[in-house]
A protein has these predicted regions:
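Conserved SAM/SAH-binding beta-strand->alpha-helix loop
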Residues: 129
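C-terminal substrate-binding/active-site "lid" region of AdoMet-derived donor-dependent transferases
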Residues: 181-238
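A short SAM/SAH-binding and catalytic strip from SAM-dependent methyltransferases
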Residues: 172-184
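S-adenosyl-L-methionine
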Residues: 5-96, 133-168
Length: 238
């Protein structure tokens, strides 16, 4: 009887050991993949430069001041975090033909991050409020003066205007921080996206597109400035 109990205990300990080993092995493999990915894209260096650009920028305060005389729920401000956002972009096919747009680009973080890390043709931000737009333009000037980023900065541009009326015809990849977009604005934007023939991929936060032209293909959690939300990647249906 004692031998049976000892054998059973030994067996259970062995199973527990194998489970722990597999979990640790899986974690190590994941960390190795992340390290390889970061090294391949030179992310540590890009992240350091990105924080030099934006370390003294308070986009929330700039937005609050800009919205004093014009405010609505869709103007509530939020920002990307560099590494989580670049990881999100790695889930879509970005190449030298990609024209990236950020609708509601604020101080330009998503636009700058995209152009710094990926070989896009263009990286463009559209912002409604002049104060935020001006800040983004200043970050671009600062980036252009940094060693190794002259060519990347040439791909970046910022447009002061309403994303419901600005020309989006060349966009192939669009990012929308859509967490606070509702009602007529959200419906109008979905209608616009449907009419863009070059557009192949749309990334939204917190909710999916309400469109028959785009199919949801991936859902992932992403760290944003206000917390963790779901990001949704949509592809145009053929």
């Amino acid at each position: 009887m004692l031998d049976f109990i000892s054998s059973k205990t030994l067996f259970l300990c062995l199973i527990l050991f194998l489970i722990l080993f597999w979990l640790c092995f899986g974690k190590a493999r994941k960390e190795l993949r992340i390290n390889r990915w970061q090294k391949k894209l030179n992310l540590k260096h890009h992240a350091r430069i990105f924080h030099l650009l934006y370390g003294d920028v308070n986009g929330f305060m700039i937005s609050q001041q800009a919205r004093k005389n014009r405010d609505a729920i869709e103007y509530v401000y939020g920002e990307i975090e560099f590494l989580p956002f670049t990881a999100l972009l790695s889930m879509v096919n970005i190449d030298h033909n990609t024209v990236f747009y950020d609708l509601g680009s604020g101080t330009g973080k998503a636009v700058v991050a995209c152009a710094m890390v990926y070989p896009v043709h263009k990286s463009i931000g559209i912002e409604l409020f002049p104060n935020l737009h001006q800040c983004a333009c200043e970050r671009l000037q600062k980036l252009a003066a940094m060693e190794g980023y002259t060519e990347s900065s040439k791909k970046i541009s910022f447009i002061l205007g309403d994303f419901l009326t600005v020309d989006l015809s060349e966009a192939t990849l669009i990012f929308i921080n859509s967490s606070t977009l509702f009602g007529a604005t959200w419906e109008a934007l979905n209608t616009r996206l449907n009419s863009l023939p070059q557009l192949s991929t749309v990334i939204t936060t917190s909710k999916t597109l309400s469109s028959s032209r785009f199919k949801l293909v991936t859902r992932a959690k992403i760290q944003m400035s206000w917390g963790v939300v779901f990001a949704f990647i949509h592809k145009r249906e053929n």
